[in-house]
């Protein structure tokens, strides 16, 4: 069975946290334009959260925001938490040794914030990730 994208939280994806709500309302929300809102959120995570090289989840969304650094798993948790808090159904995507996000608005936008050269909706291959062969998930539990 195919999972539909969700706006629900998970253990490491603290959807609805007041800090996330305030950040979105103050800085990212474009009324009536979910694509622009998603793009603003993506650029924030891509540009403001430093990449750290380690395996699996160590922090989750909130701690990644606090520390302003995280690996692909923790950056995905933060981006998913912010997007879902903004009301945007979002998947986690998993390729070979790499995680990124896929917000679903009018279409699927693949968003990998781990490299400042990546663009909203158009990630490129990095850190061993394969964006051509991947699976979609509603949670990332490792």
Segments (PLM) and residue ranges:
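Hydrophobic/aromatic-rich core segments of domains that either
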Residues: 74-141
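Catalytic cysteine-centered active-site loop
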Residues: 51-62, 66-69, 73-76, 89-97
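Secondary-structure boundary elements
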Residues: 1-67
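Short, solvent-exposed mixed-charge patches
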Residues: 1, 141-142
